Amino acid sequence: MIENILDASAVLAVLLNEKGRDKVERILDQSAISRVNVTETLTKLVEKGATISDAKKAFDELKLKIIEFDENQSLKSAELRPLTKHLGLSLGDRCCLALAILENLPAVTADRNWANLNLCKIEVIR
């Protein structure tokens, strides 16, 4: 059963052995991620020097449930822009939040500025 929606920053904490990793590792088997945030995660790994093949392999080893991006998420992400613009949230951030809101689940992130949002339950890992 899915109990959390992970932001790319939370997944990267695990893959890059960053602070907060332990909190995310404990909930991996109860978490899902938006396809948009998968792209964001893989992009960051490639930017850090991984091949796309190695990045995908590392991500796949986490065995996360991936939720495909659909019209409802698209609309909610767009609707969130004016509510999050002042914090500089990216499209990926808004896609994660949109999915969490639509699924009525907590969003798990390493981005501390999300704590200032009152859109859904947010768990900051560090």
Where are the regions that the model predicts?
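Acidic, PIN/NYN-like endoribonuclease modules and their adjacent C-terminal/linker elements
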Residues: 2-3, 97, 101-126
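Alpha-helix capping/helix-boundary segments
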Residues: 10-11, 37, 73, 95-96, ...
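Active-site neighborhoods of divalent-metal-dependent phosphate/nucleic-acid chemistry enzymes
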Residues: 67-108
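Short acidic-hydrophobic, aromatic-tinged amphipathic segments that line or gate anion-handling sites
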Residues: 66-69, 124-126
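A general structural signal for well-ordered alpha-helical segments in protein cores
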Residues: 21, 38, 52, 74-77
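Short, well-structured N-terminal submotif of metal-dependent ribonuclease cores
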Residues: 1-33, 45-60, 126
